[in-house]
Amino acid sequence: MQRNMLKSKIHRVAVTHCELHYEGSCAIDEDLLEAANIVENERIDIWNINNGERFSTYAIKGERGSGMISLNGSAARRAQLGDLVIIAAFAVVDEAELKAGWKPDLVFVDDNNRIKGSRDHVPTQNWT
């Protein structure tokens, strides 16, 4: 059996640019791409925490160290500057890979979209 699993996530990153007339895509700081194991032209899902919008596009490289998250083309209509978004990518994984300990790459950022930490799992949610 093959499963569609979370492969990469950049959590609560702020939108820095919205370029309506740029060729469609999402430019992401190269440091964030590498940390999250997302490659150029890979399909990504973007979930806007501020307004609930959910959409798909593809990743392109943004200037390294800039903190850039630029929504381009029609995606620019889905967010405003400063909105917090989650960027995710998925992979098809077989049972053997899962049993071998396959894990996602989860990246967490500070208020300037700089990497502050990473994990390979989402903690168990508790009732509190």
Curated annotation (Swiss-Prot):
Cell compartment(s), UniProt: Cytoplasm
Annotated pathway: Cofactor biosynthesis; (R)-pantothenate biosynthesis; beta-alanine from L-aspartate: step 1/1
InterPro entries: Asp_de-COase-like_dom_sf (IPR009010), Asp_decarbox (IPR003190)
Enzyme class: lyase
EC assignment: 4.1.1.11
Catalytic residue list: 25 (schiff-base intermediate with substrate), 58 (proton donor)
Family stated for the protein in its record: Belongs to the PanD family.
HAMAP family documented for this protein: PanD
Protein name: Aspartate 1-decarboxylase
Species whose genome carries this gene: Paraburkholderia xenovorans (strain LB400)
